[in-house]
């Protein structure tokens, strides 16, 4: 697949790397592992892009609702309806294909999930829904973002690009340094269930906690000159 993608790009002379490569490769790989029919793979692209935009759509919608409270104007629910319809479509497809894999298992990940058992019981629909959502969302954007970010880093740092060309053995460390610099996952959020103390910070129950990967991955107490892209960095793999 990599060769095919590169062959399709070469005659163009230039390309949109995100659209022509970084987006295509993870979808193909994920679909092959899951057992998604080729005809349905574009649906995954649409759902993933929509899920990524959904959080921003929700924020804008909340702003409009707050404004409407002051202006007494009716709230436009078109965006909310579109979001709900897209979510329903995504979960309906997931349930259908998992049900199909349960009846006719194949050598793929969805078949394994659909037919897995805990204490002799098949997984609940709620568990299957959660697995489906996690797989199609988390299995794509991190790889796409890392591929795109790596090309950007190499473009901005020609000296590091030349080092990699001259010494391909640096590739594993190059990948680790790219992940550190890019931090393809922005943050992880949690909600406290009871009073909790982390370091000097006391948090009450129900408080929101956010861990920013990018901040940790550029911690100067861990990484010397943390904003520098260095494919020979000795502790590049210490990223989160």
Q: What are these model-derived regions, one by one?
A:
Residues 1-240:
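Cytochrome P450
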């Amino acid at each position: 697949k990599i060769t095919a993608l590169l062959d399709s790009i070469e005659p163009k002379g230039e390309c949109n790397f995100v659209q022509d490569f970084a987006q295509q490769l993870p979808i193909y790989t994920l679909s092959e592992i899951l057992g998604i029919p080729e005809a349905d793979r574009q649906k995954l692209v649409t759902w993933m892009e929509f899920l990524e935009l959904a959080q921003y759509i929700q924020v804008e919608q909340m702003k409009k609702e707050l404004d409407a409270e002051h202006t007494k104007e009716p709230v436009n629910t078109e965006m909310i309806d579109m979001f709900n319809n897209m979510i329903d479509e995504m979960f309906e497809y997931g349930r259908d294909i998992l049900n199909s894999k349960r009846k006719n298992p194949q050598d793929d990940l969805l078949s394994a999930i659909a037919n897995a058992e805990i204490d002799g019981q098949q997984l609940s629909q709620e568990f299957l829904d959660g697995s489906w959502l996690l797989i199609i969302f988390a299995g794509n954007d991190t790889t796409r973002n890392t591929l795109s970010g790596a090309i950007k880093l190499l473009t901005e740092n020609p000296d590091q690009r030349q080092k990699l060309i001259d010494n391909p053995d640096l590739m594993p460390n190059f990948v680790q340094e790219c992940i550190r610099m890019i931090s393809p996952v922005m943050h992880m959020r949690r909600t406290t269930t009871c009073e909790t103390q982390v370091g000097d910070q006391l948090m009450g129950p129900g408080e929101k906690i956010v861990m920013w990967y990018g901040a940790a991955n550029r911690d100067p107490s861990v990484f010397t000159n943390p904003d520098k892209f260095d494919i020979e960095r000795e502790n590049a793999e210490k990223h989160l």
